[in-house]
Regions:
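A hydrophobic C-terminal alpha-helical subdomain
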Residues: 334-338, 397-438
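Mid/C-terminal beta-alpha module of Rossmann-like enzyme folds, strongest
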Residues: 354, 358-415
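Conserved Rossmann-fold NAD(P)-dependent oxidoreductase catalytic core, especially the SDR/UDP-sugar
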Residues: 193-194, 198-202, 209-217, 221-272, ...
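Amphipathic terminal alpha-helices
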Residues: 106, 127-134, 426-460
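Phosphopantetheine-dependent thiolation modules in NRPS/PKS and related acyl-activating systems
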Residues: 1-97
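N-terminal Rossmann/SDR dinucleotide-binding element
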Residues: 80-198, 202-205, 212
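Active-site Tyr-X1-5-Lys
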Residues: 265-299
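NAD(P)-dependent short-chain dehydrogenase/reductase
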Residues: 251-258, 286-343, 348-353, 357, ...
Length: 460
C-alpha cells in the first residue's frame, strides 16, 4: 500500500529534501521515507549527502542512524551529541594471557577473498607444517565458490608458482559464517569439526559505513559462530581484528591502546565497523576468560600494498587512506593538522607473514598489534609525490573539497569536521619484542614504495 507522503515542516527539512531530490532524481519524496529502504541510497549517495550537509557537521554515520529527513533534521536541530552505542561498552572485560601452541596441520580460513586473507592463504601454502587449508567462501554475484577463489588467486598471485600447492592443500567450502553451522549442512559441519586444528578468522565486513545490523551479523554474530565451531572442534582460534577498536579520543587525552587493553574510555562516533570489531573482541575475550577456547587476537593497522611487488587490493577506491590522499592530490592543498599526522604503513605480505610466524612461536600474549612502528608523517608522504601542496586552514580546506563534488572525499571532510577527536594512539611494544625474539622486524618505508603508492592513487 502507498505510504502517505509527509511534506517538510521546516526550512531545514526542505533543504535536506531538495538535496535528496537532486541526488536521487526522485520527485516525490516524503520526509518519512527511509533513505535506504524507500529511496535506495547507496554508500556514494550517503557520502554525497554528508558532504553537502557538512556545514551542519553531519557525518556519514549520522545518516545511517537518522535515516529519514525528519530524524536527520531533528538530529541537526538538537545538535544531539549522544552517541548511539557508547552505553554498550562494557568495562569489565579483561585480557588474560595464557600461552598455548597452535597445531597448524589443518586450518579453516575465512575471508580468503579479502586482501589480507588471500595473503594469509599464501603464507599457509608455503608453510610445510600446514597440510590442508579449508577455505570457507560464500557464493556471491552469480559466482560460484570456485570462481571467487580463482579470481582472487589470479588477481593477487598471477606470477607466483603456487598451482601445485593449491591443488595439494586447498579444500573449498561453500558456506557463510553469518549463519548457523557456518552455512554448511549439519553433516558437513560435523565432519569438518573432526578435521580442523586451527581456525584463522579473517573474514569481516570492513566497509567504513553502513547499517549497524548488517555489520553486527558480519562481525559479531559471525565471530560467535566461529567461537561455537572452535568449542565443537576443540580447534584453536586466531582472530583478525583492527587497531581501530581503540576508537577515538580527545586530542588532549593521554590515552594509549596497548596489547593488554581493550577499554581506554574510547568513543566510537557511531562508527559501526569499529563498534562491531570491538564487540567481536569482547566475545572472544569472554570465552578465553571462561576457559572455553584458546585464542589469540591480531589487531591490524593500516594495511598497504605488498612490499614484494607493490600489489594492492582490487577494490582500491574502498580504501579510506588512499581516498584521503586522492582528495589532497585533487585540491593540492593541505593543513598543518594533516601534515602532522603520523601514519603506519604496514605492507600486507608482511602482516600475513608476521601473523603466521607469531602463531608458530607460541608467545605469552593474547593480543598482538600488527602494525609498522616506523611511522611516517603525512608531510613526508605528500612531499614524496613531487606535487606542490599549498598550506591553508581547515575551513578553507573543507570548502575546496566540497567544490570538487566527489562523494569519495567524504572521508577527509569527516576527519576535518572534528579536529578535537583523533584515533586513539596505540603502542606495539609487546608485539615488537615477540617479533624480535624470532628475528623479524618491520622495514622503514622507502621512496620507491611511496612512488608506487602514488601511482596506485592516480588509478582511483
Amino acid at each position: 500500500e502507498e505510504k502517505e507522503k509527509v511534506k517538510p515542516n521546516t526550512d531545514l527539512e526542505k533543504e535536506i529534501l531538495n538535496i535528496l531530490k537532486s541526488i536521487t532524481g526522485i520527485k516525490d519524496i516524503s520526509t518519512t521515507d527511509d533513505f535506504f529502504e524507500d529511496l535506495g541510497l547507496d554508500s556514494l549517495n550517503v557520502m554525497e549527502l554528508s558532504t553537502r550537509l557538512s556545514k551542519y557537521k553531519i557525518e556519514i554515520q549520522d545518516i545511517n542512524y537518522y535515516s529519514n529527513i525528519q530524524k536527520l533534521a531533528k538530529k541537526i536541530e538538537t545538535h544531539n551529541k549522544v552517541n548511539f552505542f557508547e552505553d554498550k561498552i562494557r568495562n569489565d572485560i579483561s585480557i588474560i594471557n595464557r600461552p598455548f601452541k597452535y597445531n597448524m596441520s589443518s586450518v579453516l580460513l575465512t575471508g580468503v577473498t579479502g586482501f589480507l586473507g588471500s595473503n594469509i592463504l599464501y603464507e599457509l601454502l608455503i608453510n610445510p607444517e600446514v597440510k590442508k587449508i579449508y577455505c570457507l567462501i560464500r557464493k556471491k554475484y552469480n559466482m560460484t565458490v570456485e570462481d571467487r577463489f580463482n579470481k582472487i588467486v589470479n588477481n593477487y598471485f598471477s606470477n607466483y608458482d603456487i598451482k601445485e600447492l593449491i591443488d595439494k592443500k586447498v579444500v573449498l567450502l561453500d558456506g557463510n559464517f553469518e549463519e548457523i553451522y557456518l552455512g554448511l549442512t549439519l553433516e558437513e559441519y560435523y565432519n569438518l569439526s573432526k578435521k580442523i586444528t586451527t581456525v584463522i578468522h579473517s573474514g569481516a565486513n570492513v566497509r567504513h559505513y553502513g547499517k549497524y545490523d548488517v555489520f553486527y551479523k558480519a562481525n559479531v554474530q559471525a565471530t560467535k559462530n566461529i567461537i561455537r565451531f572452535c568449542i565443537d572442534s576443540k580447534a584453536k582460534l586466531a582472530h583478525i581484528s583492527t587497531i581501530s577498536v581503540g576508537g577515538y579520543c580527545n586530542v588532549n587525552d593521554k590515552k594509549l591502546l596497548t596489547e593488554n587493553k581493550i577499554n581506554v574510555d574510547q568513543t566510537f562516533k557511531n562508527h559501526v565497523y569499529m563498534i562491531t570489531k570491538y564487540e567481536a573482541e569482547c566475545e572472544i575475550l569472554k570465552e578465553i576468560e571462561n576457559k572455553n577456547i584458546d585464542a589469540k587476537i591480531f589487531r591490524l593497522g593500516n594495511i598497504m600494498p605488498r612490499i614484494s611487488d607493490g600489489r594492492f587490493q582490487i577494490n582500491m577506491h574502498q580504501n579510506g587512506f588512499l581516498s584521503r590522499l586522492k582528495t589532497l592530490l585533487d585540491i593540492k592543498y593541505t593543513t598543518n593538522e594533516i601534515n602532522n599526522l603520523h601514519i603506519d604503513i604496514s605492507p600486507v605480505d608482511l602482516c600475513a607473514k608476521f601473523i603466521i610466524k607469531l602463531m608458530e612461536a607460541s608467545c605469552e600474549n593474547t593480543v598482538f598489534h600488527i602494525s609498522n612502528p616506523n611511522f611516517i608523517s603525512m608531510k613526508e608522504i605528500l612531499n614524496s609525490f613531487n606535487v606542490e601542496f599549498k598550506l591553508t586552514n581547515v575551513e578553507n580546506c573543507i570548502n575546496l573539497i566540497n567544490k570538487l563534488n566527489n562523494p569519495l572525499n567524504a572521508h577527509l571532510v569527516n576527519d576535518l569536521l572534528s579536529p578535537e577527536l583523533i584515533e586513539t594512539p596505540y603502542s606495539c611494544d609487546i608485539t615488537m619484542k615477540d617479533l624480535n625474539s624470532i628475528k623479524l622486524e618491520w622495514p622503514k618505508i622507502t621512496k620507491d614504495y611511496l612512488k608506487n603508492l602514488y601511482n596506485l592513487i592516480m588509478q582511483i
